[in-house]
Amino acid sequence: MFSRLLAAITRKTYRAIEEPQANPAPPTQAPPGQGQENAHAARPEAQRAHALFDAGDYSAARDAYEHLAQTQAAPGLMVNCGYCELMLGEPDKARKSFEAALALAPHLAQAWVGLGDIAARHNRHEEALRAYDKAIALEDSQGIARNNRAQSLLALGRLEEAWRENEARFSTPGATALYPHRLALPRWDGGAGRRLLVHWEQGFGDIIQHLRFLPLAVQRIAQVGGGSCNFECPPPLLTLLQRMPGAPTIIAAGEMAPELSSFDCQAPLLSLPLLLGCRADALPSTPYLRADQPAADVLGQAWRQRDTRRLVGIAWRASSFDPQRSLTLAALLAAFAPRATELRLVSLQKDISAEERALLTLHEGIDAGANFDSFDDTAAALAAVDSVVSVDTAVAHLAGALARPTLLLLNEPAAVRWMPDVEDSPWYGSLRLLRKNANDDWEVLLRRAATLL
């Protein structure tokens, strides 16, 4: 499973604001070694191979790179083959390609990044760090190596180090797609007494996870009179954040440009823990968001009319950037069918298909997501149910931010924020993490979840 940064690097099609899903999933890969195969770079065959990679046709791209490599043993072409194989889920072949590149060019930093990425995909993060460190030692400007190193540090729970290294995300290929803000304002240094603009970045899951740091920024700015903290917010989160305790001034995305002169400095949302000097053992606790309780009460009363079963909110589909996080509604309903007399399922999924809606109705489920216009609606539904079962999507982050009891269903390797081999999370105390073994299918994990409710 690869992160959205890889999609931005390779396909240039990243949509920073997704539907409820979204940070870093397991560490990102470097782009193909474009430019490493200097003898071939100008050839039409090389451009075609790069285009195939960018289009996501990794099998055809590998064939094209291998064809080029037959005429000259160019280590950059071998690196490109390795990334194709990594994207195709063939890490053993990828390792051989990266090692072959290093045999010809021991100082090729990108090949070391590739070896680190393979280790990280198998949750061998200490090994990954050693490979990334070699890449950085060979080429200090390796922003991709530093960014991927940050992801492994996150997986190991070394958050303070990870936050520092994660600043390299702005110097990676594809950064302009992931981080579209190019504000003519200096970066905030974490000091007080400034008119600060914090701006969102990445997907909704990442945003929700890091909203907890906004009240701390408000407090820091207020330490010296005259300062103010403002947050540029994606519209689907606007109403929910206006109810957030200790929130900054909320500005809808797209409305801030004319007011840029009102601010002295800016900061990306995911840089706040670094700028604020936060510690891993003192993360802001949950809940830090509040649902519209009257709206939640109305939903709860409607759903419980003449029905005493407990309500379980469900979300089964994650972002299209990482389809391996998703399962099918049919599998979820089948696993919970033996408890149908005790539990009633409430879909928290937006835009379900007609087939899914019919299947949900057949099992006496509730399609709450049909009425979702914003995350405030989702939050009210989360507050109305008794518990939640969700794959790794923004719904799970929102449930955690609201401190709702949640079973989080994870495939492996899971996103680094969830850390390997643990059942709890320092980010959300109300979440229990259930992990799908590599040899299991979702049904095994779903049956376990059904017994835990």
Predicted regions and their residues:
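Alpha-helical solenoid repeat scaffolds of the TPR/TPR-like class and their adjacent stem/linker regions
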Residues: 1-387, 392-453
